[in-house]
Amino acid sequence: MAVYNYDVVVLGSGPAGEGAAMNAAKAGRKVAMVDSRRQVGGNCTHLGTIPSKALRHSVRQIMQFNTNPMFRAIGEPRWFSFPDVLKSAEKVISKQVASRTGYYARNRVDLFFGTGSFADEQTVEVVCANGVVEKLVAKHIIIATGSRPYRPADIDFHHPRIYDSDTILSLGHTPRKLIIYGAGVIGCEYASIFSGLGVLVELVDNRDQLLSFLDSEISQALSYHFSNNNITVRHNEEYERVEGLDNGVILHLKSGKKIKADALLWCNGRTGNTDKLGMENIGVKVNSRGQIEVDENYRTCVTNIYGAGDVIGWPSLASAAHDQGRSAAGSIVDNGSWRYVNDVPTGIYTIPEISSIGKNEHELTKAKVPYEVGKAFFKSMARAQIAGEPQGMLKILFHRETLEVLGVHCFGYQASEIVHIGQAIMSQPGEQNTLKYFVNTTFNYPTMAEAYRVAAYDGLNRLF
């Protein structure tokens, strides 16, 4: 058994692991990366964010082609199978792997591919694919192993008609009707994707509102859009059992209802990838969802072991995971890069997409903050009209006395890009965070960004 010594060992090469490894390496530390795959990138690159967003992009292009009057004049709408559309995602994955492998090489991070587990608080043993065991001894270890779909024990996920958000990428046909159980971010995103391919979607939600953490007006806009696009949303429902058939699936609900479809996609929750890490050897406890607890420095109860990304739970976003990993390494190398990551914009890649940052109306009302609202509807924006994307709006919440921007919520074309302008202003100190910035700034025309000026004027007009 070969033994290697490092300053920092990172478990997992997803966004959190990459952020941690790069920060530690750039600070001059000797770093090793361990990943169970033979390629870097983690679930984000291979099964999650990258393939699903590439898939969404292709589906959106198909939808634009089929709804554009100019193209419709040429011929009938074109429909593509799910496997055909998925091929575009596979190309992006290989490009991402190549890019990220280069990052590690340039920063002299050693890569170990195999199953890593703790022998003790400073030792990780890696069982490689060829059976060779490598021992990595480190001063500090960062757990960034990510998460996987939560699988209830009473559901047969080996059945050829039952999928989760990882295995759905192996779907070899296009179902006529699909049940999606779980209307969280992943469930809503896949509902949009399959609806865009002409699939009838039954979206089963165990809550009374879609994505209840969003501003209620944005959530309602998404619900309305879904209802117009072959997506039936069933709220306040819980599964009793899932019955797999040769030609489909029947979902039995506790309410007594039954839904039959060609396939079922399970999107109800995530589980941290900690079960194979040998956590009992280091005294770090995990909760019922396999997640570990960390403090504001991303340190666990063991002083030299840290955690970042999906494995620590909220907010379970790739963007946040990268910053959490970078901050965990910052706590170790003490180079001024640490920060507690809590000001993260939410990006939801439904069709149209959603993004927000800051407080929503419910939160501000509950806190008794005197706020006002400014709105810009995309149907009136020149750029949205040119792009043929009239659905959506930008909504700014601001303090009616100080004009401080308190929240930005966007639904529609380029929402995940638009939100960053509001994020930049909200991060400014003191009086520099003001709604007047949007009034006094010249925006390129025509752009989606100028929606900020329209919304700002709308908000100011409400004051008296």
Swiss-Prot record:
Conversion of NADPH, generated by peripheral catabolic pathways, to NADH, which can enter the respiratory chain for energy generation. The gene is sthA. It comes from the Bacteria. SUPFAM superfamilies: FAD/NAD(P)-binding domain, FAD/NAD-linked reductases, dimerisation (C-terminal) domain. It comes from Pseudomonas fluorescens (strain SBW25). It is found in: Cytoplasm. Its cofactor is FAD. This is Soluble pyridine nucleotide transhydrogenase. One of its GO terms (molecular function) is flavin adenine dinucleotide binding. GO terms for cellular component: cytosol. InterPro entries: Class-I_Pyr_Nuc-Dis_Oxidored, FAD/NAD-bd_sf, FAD/NAD-binding_dom, FAD/NAD-linked_Rdtase_dimer_sf, Pyr_nuc-diS_OxRdtase, Pyr_nucl-diS_OxRdtase_dimer, STH_gammaproteobact.
